[in-house]
Regions:
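Conserved beta-loop-beta element that borders a ligand/cofactor-binding pocket
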Residues: 12-34
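A conserved pocket-lining segment of Rossmann-fold NAD(P)-dependent short-chain dehydrogenase/reductase
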Residues: 43-65, 69
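Mid/C-terminal beta-alpha module of Rossmann-like enzyme folds, strongest
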Residues: 71-74, 79-127, 167-169
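Glycine-rich "substrate-gating" loop/helix at the edge of Rossmann-like oxidoreductase active sites
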Residues: 1-4, 29-37, 57-65
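Residue-level signal for the nucleotide or nucleotide-sugar donor/cofactor binding architecture
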Residues: 6, 62-65, 94, 151-154
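Conserved active-site helix of classical SDR/Rossmann-fold NAD(P)-dependent CH-OH oxidoreductases
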Residues: 5-17, 71-72
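Amphipathic terminal alpha-helices
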Residues: 154-169
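Conserved C-terminal active-site "lid" loop/helix of NAD(P)H-dependent oxidoreductases
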Residues: 67, 74, 97-101, 121-150
Length: 169
């Protein structure tokens, strides 16, 4: 995963430093909203059956973005964004140990089981373990300031609740 991040950073830097274009890169948080992976039937079912564990201490920080906010930010960036790298995320980064149990509770499910990192590496691989235990959140301050963008769904808590209210089980 680290090599992939290095490659992404390299491409972002090359793009934003290109002399003949006003290159910009948008870094999106974890998408959520109707029809997204997080709220797809199989994922919700797995959460309800406690098949999505809390890995290690759940110390990974996640930033989320509602798909409607991502679309709005993209349109604004294309229309008036200057060169640079912009994080398109909500206002409330969250630790996995915070958002995963909260989502389970919103579904009326029991809290996720805890699984040690070593076991999760064997069962799910290093990538998932890193996401759940080491990921770092992004800040949307630059996107708000330079693009004039404001997420309509500023909190994942409220956004998750809204999506679940309109979703049919």
């Amino acid at each position: 995963m680290r090599r992939a991040l290095e490659a992404i950073r390299y491409l972002e830097n090359r793009l934003t430093a290109a002399p003949d274009i006003a290159g910009l890169a948008l870094r999106y948080g974890a998408f959520y909203g109707p029809g997204t992976g997080l709220f797809a039937g199989p994922v919700i079912d797995r959460l309800r059956r406690r098949r999505v564990p809390l890995i290690g201490g759940g110390n990974g920080w996640w930033s989320f973005v509602h798909v409607d906010d991502a679309a709005a930010a993209t349109a604004i960036a294309v229309e008036r964004g200057g060169p640079g790298i912009y994080n398109i995320v909500d206002d409330e980064p969250a630790l996995v140990r915070e958002w995963l149990p909260a989502l389970a509770a919103m579904l009326g499910a029991k809290p996720p089981r805890h699984v040690p990192k070593w076991l999760a590496r064997i069962a799910a691989g290093e990538h998932l373990v890193t996401l759940m235990t080491e990921a770092r959140a992004g800040s949307n301050v630059k996107a708000k300031r330079r693009l004039g963008w404001q997420p309509e769904h500023a909190s994942w808590r409220r956004g998750f609740t809204e999506v679940l209210e309109v979703r049919t089980p």
